[in-house]
Amino acid sequence: MDFWLYKQAQQNGHHIAITDGQESYTYQNLYCEASLLAKRLKAYQQSRVGLYIDNSIQSIILIHACWLANIEIAMINTRLTPNEMTNQMRSIDVQLIFCTLPLELRGFQIVSLDDIEFAGTDITTNGLLDNTMGIQYDTSNETVVPKDSPSNILNTSFNLDDIASIMFTSGTTGPQKAVPQTFRNHYASAIGCKESLGFDRDTNWLSVLPIYHISGLSVLLRAVIEGFTVRIVDKFNAEQILTMIKNERITHISLVPQTLNWLMQQGLHEPYDLQKILLGGAKLSASMIETALQYNLPIYNSFGMTETCSQFLTATPEMLHARPDTVGMPSANVDVKIKNPNKKGHGELMIKGANVMNGYLYPTDLTGTFENGYFNTGDIAEIDHEGYVMIYDRRKDLIISGGENIYPYQIETVAKQFPGIIDAVCVGHPDDTWGQVPKLYFVSESNISKAQLIAYLSQHLAKYKVPKHFEKVDTLPYTSTGKLQRNKLYRG
């Protein structure tokens, strides 16, 4: 198959591929820049590299250049500690890291994009492409890679089953795992998203989620497959994002629930040109859904994983109005089922589809990942008679107290409705009698007593579900995409 960027450069070359508000690159420009850089990257003779990058045009060029040079990219979360980065990269045998941000990491060859010399004018485009932006390329270092060197030859096609990217699970429930994502996985995910969410060549997608996460990278893949424009943003600022929505004809945006909340607080009280607000990464509260729908905001709740190359369940505004707790229905190209449902229909969510990874790169000895072709997500879910899917909790988060299954989300939902509580999370606390009992961590600026909380929660929850321990904290641990890191709260 032809590289998607190469195909867009041929068929959709003058369309804007990427803009940061200051610079804009057409698909022709993007392909030319990526091709020139790819020749430089091939000189490093690496089949797999780490990427330590920001949300920028240069980072996007680097990603495509790696693919054109047949290099697998391992995405590095820039919020990790040096030790965490080292452990991740060593686990998958990465020796070299390309970066668009300053990085010092012992034991690796670190190469800044600014230090990579560009090839010049000997790239062949067969007359298909032209430099419509008038970009000037520096040809003074032409001898760095000989023109006829094998490393100077770029492929314009690829194998769908080759690994495109490697990401590590967010580590919200334990040790991180290396997830290989093939071009086929990404393509199937994009097609499923188009069917369930909807986008076309006229889409203008504002992307502020980190590229090093699947939620950010998947937008770039959808764009290059379909040929639409991405408005890339490096950092989330509610005031600035709202201004972009108002003034830049933004049709699509990917957010986590908290960032949507900040935007509504900032004044996002009408859709403007927005056609789709794609939400994911954390649970969406009923109150937020109600507020967003009152503003006629086109919110689409979703559920996906690193292992599934982003979303595979999507809930439309109509679905959310009918059932606020749903994450919707599966994309047409995937199959989902519930394993071993209990009397309430709750069981482990299983998925099968071309978007699902084939198995972890690290650790390689994990068992129970797949069963009869279905990937075990590890989530407790339900599929109702209309086909709506509800996600309740990670199986690892389930609290088993005296033989009773307790879903933390149910307790958290009730606790967050208590006046003065800003945020709350419930985890299992070791107990000599019951094995585990619920413990509630909460954030509040008010003085709330344990007795007050017990009295309130007892009105809404069965006695065995009422937390036995409470702890007020300043903040709760979240990842950069808004996922709660419960494992950091598991302590005696």
From Swiss-Prot:
Converts 2-succinylbenzoate (OSB) to 2-succinylbenzoyl-CoA (OSB-CoA). This is 2-succinylbenzoate--CoA ligase. One of its GO terms (molecular function) is o-succinylbenzoate-CoA ligase activity. It comes from Staphylococcus aureus (strain MRSA252). PANTHER family: LONG-CHAIN-FATTY-ACID--COA LIGASE (PTHR43767), NONRIBOSOMAL PEPTIDE SYNTHASE PES1 (EUROFUNG)-RELATED (PTHR43767:SF1). SUPFAM superfamilies: Acetyl-CoA synthetase-like (SSF56801). The keyword Nucleotide-binding applies. It catalyses: 2-succinylbenzoate + ATP + CoA = 2-succinylbenzoyl-CoA + AMP + diphosphate. InterPro entries: AMP-bd_C, AMP-bd_C_sf, AMP-dep_synth/lig_dom, ANL_N_sf, ATP-dep_AMP-bd_enzyme, MenE. Keywords: ATP-binding, Ligase, Menaquinone biosynthesis, Nucleotide-binding. GO terms for biological process: menaquinone biosynthetic process. Its EC number is 6.2.1.26. Gene3D superfamilies: 3.30.300.30, N-terminal domain of ligase-like (3.40.50.12780). It comes from the Bacteria. Belongs to the ATP-dependent AMP-binding enzyme family. MenE subfamily. Pathway: Quinol/quinone metabolism; 1,4-dihydroxy-2-naphthoate biosynthesis; 1,4-dihydroxy-2-naphthoate from chorismate: step 5/7; Quinol/quinone metabolism; menaquinone biosynthesis.
